[in-house]
Every structure is written in C-alpha cells, then in structure tokens.
C-alpha cells in the first residue's frame, strides 16, 4: 500500500500508482535520450525488449521509493 491518498482531478480519481507510472515514464525518456547517442543500442539484441526491461526496472525503483 502506498502512503499517498487517491487524488481527484476534475472528478476523475487517480490511484497513487498512476503518478508513479508517469514519473517512471519521464525518467525512462530521459535515460533513453541519454543512451541513444552513446551507441549502446548497437550492442542490444532486441531494442524493444531492452526498452521494456529498462522501463520495468525504473518503475520498480520508483515504486520502492514511495512505499
């Protein structure tokens, strides 16, 4: 359980995990933009799978911070 309450915006209720997902997505975009120029994707076998795993790891780290 998260310590944050459900947030209501314009009558729509959002669980706390929604904002954790958005935060991890923003960090993923930043990390992705930093990794592309380094050429690390030349060594990655499946870029879409790598991106998915990277996002899942970032989401896990963010969600552990807020619990």
Curated annotation (Swiss-Prot):
It is found in: Cell membrane. One of its GO terms (cellular component) is plasma membrane. It is a multi-pass membrane protein. The keyword Transmembrane helix applies. The chain crosses the membrane at residues 3-23, 43-63. It comes from the Bacteria. InterPro entries: DUF1656 (IPR012451). HAMAP family: AaeX. This is Protein AaeX. The gene is aaeX.
């Amino acid at each position: 359980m998260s310590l944050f309450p459900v947030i209501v915006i314009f009558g729509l209720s959002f669980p706390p995990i929604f904002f954790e997902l958005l935060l991890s997505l923003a960090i993923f975009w930043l990390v992705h933009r930093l990794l592309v120029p380094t050429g690390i994707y030349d060594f990655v076998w499946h870029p879409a799978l790598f991106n998915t795993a990277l996002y899942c790891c970032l989401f896990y780290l963010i969600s552990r911070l807020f619990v």
